[in-house]
């Protein structure tokens, strides 16, 4: 903790609240996060929000290449100074939401990358869906996030936390909770507990779907209003190519009644419903 404060003081930097800057200051947690990524010497890592570069250096000692993405210009200057001895680190001043992961693939002739990062709580959902959009370029993601966000990713059907993120990420990745990180591990202390989540993204979805775009569309429509039944939400979606009668018949064929809500349907059932819609 003292070390982090000292670096900030030496560079006359104060954490920027609007960027959600809370610097991880526990070295044991940093080491565990990097170990969870199981970095091999021929792999490329993209780090989200490299901050002061403390965890970046741990990655650089293991990986072939590290792309350290940081939006704060002052921190970029710190990173370039602190990491200048690592010739396998590229410091990128930019917004991760605008970062093209194909850049990391193209420069280093690799097929897949790994992602490590402490996601700012205020933009956790946009970052997660940016990762999901680029899933074909990513093999593993080890991400620290607000506990409530991790709860939604790892939820089971029938619970309040089960929703759109659960189903969409659950189709494409094996997700596991790995660490709980207390507020005292950061400077300044956040008001919430953090969780480190590991995502393993295989070549193919965990459940086969005929049409990815239709799956996204279906899931988002199904959860539009949680208190309504899935059937009513689909009616309100006004799909020209999908009338309520078809949905009702398909749900009945799956053994799910017309009163079922979206949060009661498993990821596998969503995939089956999507495929039935594709072929019916």
Swiss-Prot record:
Transmembrane segments: none annotated. It comes from the Bacteria. PROSITE patterns: RRNA_A_DIMETH (PS01131), SAM_RNA_A_N6_MT (PS51689). Signal peptide: none annotated. It is an enzyme of class 2 (transferase). Its main location: cytoplasm. It catalyses: adenosine(1518)/adenosine(1519) in 16S rRNA + 4 S-adenosyl-L-methionine = N(6)-dimethyladenosine(1518)/N(6)-dimethyladenosine(1519) in 16S rRNA + 4 S-adenosyl-L-homocysteine + 4 H(+). SMART domains: rADc. One of its GO terms (molecular function) is 16S rRNA (adenine(1518)-N(6)/adenine(1519)-N(6))-dimethyltransferase activity. It is found in: Cytoplasm. It holds the Pfam family RrnaAD. PANTHER family: DIMETHYLADENOSINE TRANSFERASE (PTHR11727), DIMETHYLADENOSINE TRANSFERASE-RELATED (PTHR11727:SF7). This is Ribosomal RNA small subunit methyltransferase A. It comes from Syntrophus aciditrophicus (strain SB). The gene is rsmA.
């Amino acid at each position: 903790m003292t070390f982090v404060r000292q670096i900030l003081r030496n560079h006359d930097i104060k954490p920027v609240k609007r960027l959600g800057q809370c610097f991880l200051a526990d070295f044991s947690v940093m080491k565990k996060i990097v170990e969870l990524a199981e970095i091999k010497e021929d792999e490329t890592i993209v780090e989200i929000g490299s901050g002061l570069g403390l965890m970046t250096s741990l990655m650089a000692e293991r990986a072939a290449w590290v792309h350290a993405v940081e939006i704060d210009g002052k921190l970029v200057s710190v990173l370039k100074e602190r990491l200048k001895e690592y010739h396998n680190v590229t410091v990128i001043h930019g917004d991760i939401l605008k970062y093209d992961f194909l850049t990391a693939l193209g420069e280093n002739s690799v097929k897949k990358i790994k992602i490590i990062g402490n996601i700012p709580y205020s933009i956790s959902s946009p970052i997660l869906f940016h990762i999901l959009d680029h899933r074909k370029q990513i093999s593993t993601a080890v991400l620290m996030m607000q506990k409530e966000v991790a709860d939604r990713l790892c939820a089971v059907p029938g619970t309040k936390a089960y929703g759109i993120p659960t189903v969409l990420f659950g189709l494409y990745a094996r997700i596991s909770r790995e660490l709980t990180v207390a507020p005292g591990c950061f400077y300044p202390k956040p008001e919430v507990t953090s969780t480190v989540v590991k995502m393993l993204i295989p070549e193919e979805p965990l459940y086969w779907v005929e049409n990815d775009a239709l799956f996204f569309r279906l899931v988002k429509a199904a959860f539009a209003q949680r208190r309504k039944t899935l059937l009513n939400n689909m009616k309100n979606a006004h799909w020209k190519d999908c009338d309520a009668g078809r949905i009702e018949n398909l749900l009945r064929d799956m053994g799910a009644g017309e009163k079922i809500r979206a949060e009661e349907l498993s990821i596998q059932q969503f995939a089956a419903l999507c495929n039935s819609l594709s072929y019916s």
